[in-house]
Regions:
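NAD(P)-dependent Rossmann-like dehydrogenase/reductase catalytic/cofactor-binding core
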Residues: 1-85, 91-175
Length: 175
């Protein structure tokens, strides 16, 4: 789903009701500081069949209907889920990418072998490093940072190598 009309540089837009519509950056919708509907990430917006959204606490039901209508008009099946950090796809892929970067860093396998093992062993469409690279290392890092800050749990702590790659604008798949 691409937000076009009134889209901000940060991947946000405003619904006709004035509610913020934002792509998931790891923070729950309620943490955005205003009524908001957050849209989960996908592997490929152009081919996705469905997408999850979550509304902030106190968000008007009409805003959820507006967001749902917009996404359905784009051909997506919409699933309304609880407002939680990282939603579903964003949290899962960020954690998989982080684990893969950590395995690469610790010499478990090469980047290519990690992606191949996950594609063939789990039937994922992409390996976790390729998927994380598609979203961008800085995005994966910001999602994990937001989740760790919200939960205070080290399981969301980004790998030191992920931090280094994101800071350098590098590629998760390069050894």
């Amino acid at each position: 789903m691409e937000i076009r009309a009134g889209e901000g540089r940060d991947g946000t837009a405003e619904l006709p009701s004035g509610t913020l519509l934002a792509r998931c950056d790891g923070r729950p919708a309620t943490a955005l500081g205003r009524p908001a509907v957050v849209v989960d990430r996908t592997l490929d917006d152009a081919t996705a069949a469905g997408i999850a959204i979550a509304a902030s606490d106190g968000c008007a039901a009409g805003a959820v209907d507006e967001a749902t209508g917009l996404l359905q008009a784009a051909g997506l099946t919409v699933y309304v889920i609880d407002d939680a950090p990282g939603l579903v796809v964003t949290r899962t892929v960020a954690m998989l990418a982080n684990g893969a970067v950590d395995a690469r860093h610790k010499g478990v396998a090469s980047a290519a072998d990690i992606d191949t093992a996950m594609r063939l062993g789990t039937n994922y469409p992409l390996g976790p490093l390729a998927w994380g690279q598609r979203w961008g290392p800085a995005t994966v890092l910001s999602v994990l940072d937001a989740m760790q800050a919200w939960y205070g749990d080290d399981r969301y702590r980004p790998s030191a190598l992920l931090r280094r790659i994101a800071a350098a604008g590098g590629d998760l798949r390069e050894n």
